[in-house]
Every structure is written in C-alpha cells, then in structure tokens.
C-alpha cells in the first residue's frame, strides 16, 4: 500500500520523514520526495 502525505511546515514533515523505514530521497522540480 502506498500513502502520499503533503506537509506545509518543515516540522510536520520532519516528524513523519524520520519514521519512514528504508527511506530514499528524490528531488523533482526543486521538491524533495521521500520514498
């Protein structure tokens, strides 16, 4: 199952991003995408 989350504040994104296992970061159009 895939879930997409959009966060407006860096603090929100950081809390969720740190909990993602096996995370990869991709930059598309200046935006960071975490998979």
UniProtKB/Swiss-Prot annotation:
Q: Does the record's keyword annotation contain Transmembrane?
A: no
- Give the GO terms filed under biological process for this record: L-methionine salvage from methylthioadenosine
What is the superkingdom listed in this entry's lineage?
A: Bacteria
Sorted alphabetically, the keyword list is: Amino-acid biosynthesis, Hydrolase, Methionine biosynthesis
Query: Which reaction equation describes what this protein catalyses?
Result: S-adenosyl-L-homocysteine + H2O = S-(5-deoxy-D-ribos-5-yl)-L-homocysteine + adenine; S-methyl-5'-thioadenosine + H2O = 5-(methylsulfanyl)-D-ribose + adenine; 5'-deoxyadenosine + H2O = 5-deoxy-D-ribose + adenine
Q: Give an example GO molecular function.
A: adenosylhomocysteine nucleosidase activity
Question: Which EC class heads this enzyme's classification?
Answer: hydrolase
- Its EC number(s): 3.2.2.9
Pathway listed for it?
A: Amino-acid biosynthesis; L-methionine biosynthesis via salvage pathway; S-methyl-5-thio-alpha-D-ribose 1-phosphate from S-methyl-5'-thioadenosine (hydrolase route): step 1/2
Q: What does this protein do?
A: Catalyzes the irreversible cleavage of the glycosidic bond in both 5'-methylthioadenosine (MTA) and S-adenosylhomocysteine (SAH/AdoHcy) to adenine and the corresponding thioribose, 5'-methylthioribose and S-ribosylhomocysteine, respectively. Also cleaves 5'-deoxyadenosine, a toxic by-product of radical S-adenosylmethionine (SAM) enzymes, into 5-deoxyribose and adenine. Thus, is required for in vivo function of the radical SAM enzymes biotin synthase and lipoic acid synthase, that are inhibited by 5'-deoxyadenosine accumulation.
Query: Know the name of this protein?
Result: 5'-methylthioadenosine/S-adenosylhomocysteine nucleosidase
